[in-house]
């Protein structure tokens, strides 16, 4: 079980999240020794003070639709790092993918990576909205742009990670880019299959329920 837990970004990104929810999430994360907590940007500073370095903090920018301008995303990223984030999950502009404006996407990723330096960047491509050719192209763009991870989903779209997507990403992404599966991890079996297929990070808000074999309907 430890090999699964060390890949987990223990996540809470729902609109109604309270500070009490964040504290519970952080305590659970410490107890389970997961990879990180993934939380809203507005809670990063308080969570950093609360955790005192016990667990890495991940947050999101351009979330969940990716429509923010590059300048806005860069500001969000810098602000998150200044407040104590160790990792940043950014959403690309899906419209840019549909418009085949890949140069703009690559430039944006590079600017955000430059802004956060040696902190970890994960690029969310929202696979549920993409066809196979678009997914392959985004693997290439993310690889060339210097991101640390490519991530399947926000968990807010029409679908989450699939085993087929992870296998496709593993085939086409560069060897220096890791894969994060998110929004589709509903059981221990799911987690094991995603890891076996090539995912090195799992984003889920359901890990506690998964460990108890309870129903999982959340992100």
From Swiss-Prot:
CDD domains: DeoC. Keywords: Cytoplasm, Lyase, Schiff base. One of its GO terms (biological process) is 2-deoxyribose 1-phosphate catabolic process. Its EC number is 4.1.2.4. Pathway: Carbohydrate degradation; 2-deoxy-D-ribose 1-phosphate degradation; D-glyceraldehyde 3-phosphate and acetaldehyde from 2-deoxy-alpha-D-ribose 1-phosphate: step 2/2. Pfam families: DeoC (PF01791). The active site is at residues 89, 151, 180. The keyword Mitochondrion does not apply. InterPro entries: Aldolase_TIM, DeoC, DeoC/FbaB/LacD_aldolase, DeoC_typeI. Catalyzes a reversible aldol reaction between acetaldehyde and D-glyceraldehyde 3-phosphate to generate 2-deoxy-D-ribose 5-phosphate. This is Deoxyribose-phosphate aldolase. It comes from Clostridioides difficile (strain 630) (Peptoclostridium difficile).
């Amino acid at each position: 079980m430890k090999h699964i837990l060390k890949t987990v970004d223990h996540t809470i990104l729902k609109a109604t999240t309270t500070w009490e929810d964040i504290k519970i999430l952080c305590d659970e994360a410490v107890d389970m020794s997961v990879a990180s907590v993934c939380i809203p940007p507005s809670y990063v500073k308080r969570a950093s003070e609360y955790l005192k370095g016990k667990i890495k903090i991940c947050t999101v920018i351009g979330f969940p639709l990716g429509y923010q301008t590059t300048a806005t995303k860069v500001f969000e990223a810098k602000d998150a790092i200044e407040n104590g984030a160790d990792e940043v999950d950014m959403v690309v502009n899906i419209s840019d993918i549909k418009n085949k404006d890949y140069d703009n996407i690559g430039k944006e990723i590079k600017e955000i990576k430059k802004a956060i330096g040696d902190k970890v960047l994960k690029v969310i491509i929202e696979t549920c909205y993409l066809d196979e050719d678009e997914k392959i192209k985004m693997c290439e763009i993310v690889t060339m742009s210097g991101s640390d991870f490519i991530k399947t989903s926000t968990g807010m779209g029409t679908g989450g990670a699939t085993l087929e997507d992870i296998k496709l990403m593993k085939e086409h992404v560069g060897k220096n880019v890791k894969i994060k599966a998110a929004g589709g991890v509903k059981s221990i079996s799911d987690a094991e299959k995603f890891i076996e297929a090539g995912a090195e990070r799992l984003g889920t808000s359901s890990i506690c329920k998964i460990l108890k074999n309870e129903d999982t309907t959340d992100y």
